[in-house]
């Protein structure tokens, strides 16, 4: 209790860590470089709701600013400096700023890449003898290519890839679904946060 944590990143991971840290009575400052929380994964109304929830739980939220420098004291982390020049002092930091797929093995095999390992609707790569699934795989979804970083996608896609490795011809039909637990609130999202007509 009482320790100061600096959380860098206002996506699901950053917000979930903030909620747990507050339950443990830590002082929490969260920095998000985008103009709002959950920018890549949720609509502005959802982001606003969760911003208010965290502020009601005494999380200091800074949006639209980036970390430009880390502060060291006696060889240990002591905080960070924002692009505004403001110094944020903390005892430790947690960084959750997105997912970049690790594709060096696929690249070394000469596989086609497209924001991850490019797969078709059967989870096959550009080499039909190699299949891929999970957070590293970019797959066709409607009129675009998509890479989902979620447990549900990883499990369902792996099941399809395994069946196809055994000789089946099963198509992967993504049904994007996400959840997040923060304080006593459970968020569940079905679908994607772009291309919608209205928020209900």
Please provide the spans of the model-predicted regions.
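Rossmann-like dinucleotide-binding cores of NAD(P)H-dependent redox enzymes
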Residues: 4-6, 12-69, 150-154, 174-179
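Well-ordered beta-strand scaffold positions
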Residues: 66, 85-86, 185
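Feature captures the FAD/FMN-dependent oxidoreductase FAD-binding
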Residues: 69-76
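Generic secondary-structure signature for well-ordered alpha-helical cores
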Residues: 23, 55, 59-60, 72, ...
């Amino acid at each position: 209790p009482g320790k100061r944590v600096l959380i860098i990143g206002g996506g699901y991971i950053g917000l979930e860590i903030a909620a747990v840290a507050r339950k443990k009575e830590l002082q929490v400052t969260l920095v998000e470089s985008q103009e709002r929380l959950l920018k890549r994964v949720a609509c502005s109304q959802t982001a606003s709701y969760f911003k208010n929830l965290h502020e009601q739980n005494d999380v200091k939220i800074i949006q639209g600013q980036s970390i430009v420098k880390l502060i060291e004291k006696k060889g240990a982390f002591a905080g960070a400096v924002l692009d505004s020049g403001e110094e944020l002092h903390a005892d430790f930091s947690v960084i959750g700023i997105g997912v970049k797929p690790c594709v060096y093995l696929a690249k070394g095999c000469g596989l086609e890449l497209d924001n991850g390992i490019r797969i078709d609707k059967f989870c096959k790569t550009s080499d039909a003898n190699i299949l891929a699934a999970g957070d590293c795989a970019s797959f066709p979804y409607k009129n675009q290519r998509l890479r989902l970083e979620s447990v549900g996608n990883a499990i369902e896609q792996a099941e399809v890839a395994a069946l196809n490795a055994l000789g089946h011809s099963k198509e992967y039909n993504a049904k994007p679904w996400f959840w997040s637990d923060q304080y006593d609130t459970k968020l569940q999202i079905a679908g994607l946060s772009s291309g919608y007509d209205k928020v209900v």
